[in-house]
Amino acid sequence: KAFEIWKNYLVEMGFGYKLGVDLPGESRGFIPNSKFYNKVYGENRWSANTVISVAIGQGEILATPLQIANLSATIANRGWYYTPHVVRRISGTKLPAQYTTRHTPHINKNYYQDIAEGMRMAVVGGTCRQAQFGDIEVCGKTGTAQVDGAKSHSWFVGYSQREDLPLAVVCIAENAGYGSGVALSVSNKVMQHFLRAMT
């Protein structure tokens, strides 16, 4: 039962389904469920180790960079997100509801604060120190995705903590090694360019 609850939380946060961005070819990713594991291992023949592996990002989870950036925005907003859209500019006209509807997963808001603090500390004194940018507080997390028989993928996800400078960023560099390397360096340059342009 706990596994299905966890899976439902992920679905509410935009994983396992298309987010609905206005770009062709969007992937839905994949979040396994009990039915999937019963098919792979046999009815109720999979163990808690399978659930633990999935919970820490190992195993069969597939997420798109856009879904990860959306998760970052959800953490920055402390529990809600907009469906991502591609826009050139937003003017003073009233936007249709599809652009302004907030999606709020049924997750205790206190958890977001704890995660945000962990991401802040990763930048202050952890693997993301390179993401620091002047007096603008940045929160982030590096990741290293293992690839069988090849070099790991390098990940970084982060966001600006300032409400007047909203930015969520994600970078995956395939077969580039640790997350604190290429992905963090590229993300840092993107964030600096955006934040300089906005201040």
Regions found by a protein language model. Give the residues of each.
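Beta-lactam-recognizing serine transpeptidase/beta-lactamase-like catalytic domain environment
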Residues: 1-175, 179
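Short, gly/Ser/Thr-rich active-site loops of penicillin-recognizing serine hydrolases
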Residues: 96-97, 101, 184-199
